[in-house]
Amino acid sequence: MKVISLFILVGFIGESQIFSSASSPVNCQWDSYTPWSECNGCTKTQTRRRSVAVYGQYGGQPCVGNAFETQSCEPTRGCPTEEGCGERFRCFSGQCISKSLVCNGDSDCDEDSADEDRCEDSERRPSCDIDKPPPNIELTGNGYNELTGQFRNRVINTKSFGGQCRKVFSGDGKRFYRLSGNVLSYTFQVKINNDFNYEFYNSTWSYVKHTSTEHTSSSRKRSFFRSSSSSSRSYTTHTNEIHKGKSYQLLVVENTVEVTQFINNNPEFLQLAEPFWKELSHLPSLYDYSAYRRLIDQYGTHYLQSGSLGGEYRVLFYVDSEKLKQNGFTSVEEKKCKSSGWHFVVKFSSHGCKELENALKAASGTQNNVLRGNPFIRGGGAGFISSLSYLELDNPAGNKRRYSAWAKSVTDLPKVIKQKLTPLYELVKEVPCVSVKKLYLKRALEEYLDEFDPCHCRPCQNGGLATVEGTHCLCHCKPYTFGAACEQGVLVGNQAGGVDGGWSCWSSWSSCVQGKKTRSRECNNPPPSGGGRSCIGETTESTQCEDEELEHLRLLEPHCFPLSLVPTEFCPSPPALKDGFVQDEGTMFPVGKNVVYTCNEGYSLIGNPVARCGEDLQWLVGEMHCQKIACVLPVLMDGIQSHPQKPFYTVGEKVTVSCSGGMSLEGPSAFLCGSSLKWSPEMKNAHCVQKENPLTQAVPKCQRWEKLQNSRCVCKMPYECVPSLDVCARDERSKRILPLTVCKMHVLHCQGRNYTLTGRDSCTLPASAEKACGACPLWGKCDAESSKCVCREASECEEEGFSICVEVNGKEQTMSECEAGSLRCRGQSISVTSIRPCAAETQ
């Protein structure tokens, strides 16, 4: 570990004794509930909310109970998620995804896997040879509340690969992982910082001022509504409550361990988590702060634009200010210690630092040379946290050993650190009334930010700094003052005497005048006195009215506004666009509604993409067309298979073709997507023909699950199986249980797929049906009188099929498919335990 310097920034210039009266505790009080919201057509519920009328302070009680109430109701409007998806695929939840993601082997419908639910094996087009995502990647999709420092529910679907096959290699795991389509960059790079950062603060007031860099409401709002870096805010929450009875100074030691670095995609390319998308869909199109505030509670104020997975170590050590002063700690010792260095993992080397060590021991009231603090640890094993809460001043090796053990555990149990954030309203998309809801969520975030403004708090005495924590206010005291209201102790030097002014909360916005609205505030919380400084900032604030923006949105989305303003006449469905479709098409098109066209994958839209429903109930459509920007496979002749299979191919990509079913390829086998977006050579020159083997060529004998192709045995396709015994099996990749046959399981195993037999009752097998002669299975024979298939006796089996292991009457035995099918056909209960002969009989 490298040597680190400690900067002790405490000096005693002068003192002024303060005799302040104690402030009486103020208990939190709820305001009355707002009116009930409009009945939600999807959940058939309505909510109401109450805000805090009086914040608890000076040791008073916080508010008890929930801010929200919900009740059932009868909706007057339908559910927007019941609308269609146009040319795209509709998940069971109502969320729309590209049709190219259907039957690709990936569950792109986040919660229900509807895109893979009804796919036959022959329809599946696996888009990648691996499907294991990097460990803990789900953490990159969580929402984040910047005001509370807490991670919230998922807003990004980190499970979707988007049909892409992007891989990243982990040196620690010695394996490749498949990246989510929502991640732009994901790097496994362990960064352990050996240089511990630590600071010495002369009060909790100094600490909060340092960690909360934005103090005015306007600067807080500017920071809040732009992409910004953020670290955990929870450290400041507890600095004041722990030590109220004395004045304490803080020694803060911190460090980080990084395991992985990530960058999420731009918001327009992110696939939303289905629960979050549903909540966005359910938001009312008329502004109701209660409904939007509930979304903020569940999903936070921001989402993660980038960051690292790792661990964050921070410990706050409290030192009694008066005892430190009594031990004669002066700036002389500070300089001596600073010049020689001080480190908690090496022994003190200078006389000045030794004096500092003794002063810290005496001032912190430690015994056995142990300095105890309050740990704020993110990531790593929970069992290590208690061991990180103290430092042994005479045992630096022990300190290092405990820290290293925690740092090692971070690799397996990381959390998000060093996050860069983007406001949550940037993710409002792919829902009805998207522009209106995006505007309203931004407005709700502004109101939410105002709830945490310290203007709601009563003044702290002796220049203390108030902050809002939940439903109560805390006072962070200046050096050598303490108490619930900072009413006790002394102020040092030029801080004594005066009281600086503080802002009241902003008034409500005025009515719009010439497109602008204003609000005001006063410098009376508290007013400046005794030579104290006046408030910094403006007493009035003006901004553009939302009315103009809402009027513009009313033209784009008239159906999102009150019914009295919505036309009662509607246009038919928008005209079709070749190689394209309408985004978020919906089912109703009132006069004035605009729709936006987009193109299928592999095409780009040229022209004006917006069409408008005119007053004559006809669509006003400008010039537009979908221009090809990539190569698209033509309809291939029967028997030709292509690899890789993709919706489109960019210039320079190659495709190879082969023949199936014992056919051989005539013509070229490789094709290049050229700059003219045509295949070179032309694919029509490739076709499959029946290949006659030379008489002298030895014909290999293939297994039942194989077929002869180009003079060699290759795996059949499942649909090429002849009738075989029905079984239930679990796909170990997707964990889905499917009805298969013994033959199909052999074929899938031949192709490298991992399927495991399950009980017959675990899936729905095809019902037994009477079959005409000529379609009898192995265990059936033709009855001449009825011309129907009937059960064979086991002794009558002619073609036996596969040898399998079957449990009959509790005992396993090897028998042919025909014999097992004969028993099942006659109603006897059997269980297929292996698609191969029993192990005991093959040894």
From Swiss-Prot:
Q: Where in the cell is it found?
A: Secreted; Target cell membrane
Disulfide bridge positions per record: 28-63, 39-73, 42-79, 85-96, 91-109, 103-119, 128-165, 337-353, 433-560, 455-505, 457-473, 460-475, 477-486, 512-545, 523-535, 571-613, 599-626, 631-673, 659-688, 702-713, 715-750, 721-743, 728-763, 773-782, 776-789, 791-825, 797-818, 805-838
Domain named MACPF is located at 124-456
Q: Name one GO biological process term.
A: killing of cells of another organism
Span list, region CCP 2: 616-693
What sequence ranges are listed for the domain Sushi? 569-628, 629-690
Posttranslational modification, per the record? C-, N- and O-glycosylated. O-glycosylated with core 1 or possibly core 8 glycans.
> Its GO CC terms?
extracellular region; membrane attack complex
Region annotated Factor I module (FIM) 2, chain positions: 771-843
**Compositionally biased, Acidic residues: which spans?**
107-120
Q: Where are the annotated glycans?
A: 36, 202, 503, 506, 509, 696, 754
- Asked if the record carries the keyword Coiled coil, the reply is no
Q: Which UniProt keywords apply?
A: Complement alternate pathway, Complement pathway, Cytolysis, Disulfide bond, EGF-like domain, Glycoprotein, Immunity, Innate immunity, Membrane, Membrane attack complex, Repeat, Secreted, Signal, Sushi, Target cell membrane, Target membrane
Record's SMART domains? CCP, FIMAC, LDLa, MACPF, TSP1
Recorded hits in PROSITE patterns, A to Z, give:
EGF_1, EGF_2, LDLRA_1, LDLRA_2, MACPF_1, MACPF_2, SUSHI, TSP1
Notes on how activity is controlled? Membrane attack complex (MAC) assembly is inhibited by CD59, thereby protecting self-cells from damage during complement activation. MAC assembly is also inhibited by clusterin (CLU) chaperones that inhibit polymerization of C9.
The UniProt subunit note reads as follows: Monomer or dimer; as a C5b-7 complex it can also form multimeric rosettes. Component of the membrane attack complex (MAC), composed of complement C5b, C6, C7, C8A, C8B, C8G and multiple copies of the pore-forming subunit C9.
**Its biological purpose:** Component of the membrane attack complex (MAC), a multiprotein complex activated by the complement cascade, which inserts into a target cell membrane and forms a pore, leading to target cell membrane rupture and cell lysis. The MAC is initiated by proteolytic cleavage of C5 into complement C5b in response to the classical, alternative, lectin and GZMK complement pathways. The complement pathways consist in a cascade of proteins that leads to phagocytosis and breakdown of pathogens and signaling that strengthens the adaptive immune system. C7 serves as a membrane anchor.
Q: Which family does it belong to?
A: Belongs to the complement C6/C7/C8/C9 family.
Q: What is this protein called?
A: Complement component C7
Q: Which organism is it from?
A: Pongo abelii (Sumatran orangutan)
What are the top taxonomic ranks of the organism?
Eukaryota, Metazoa, Chordata, Craniata, Vertebrata
GN (gene name): C7
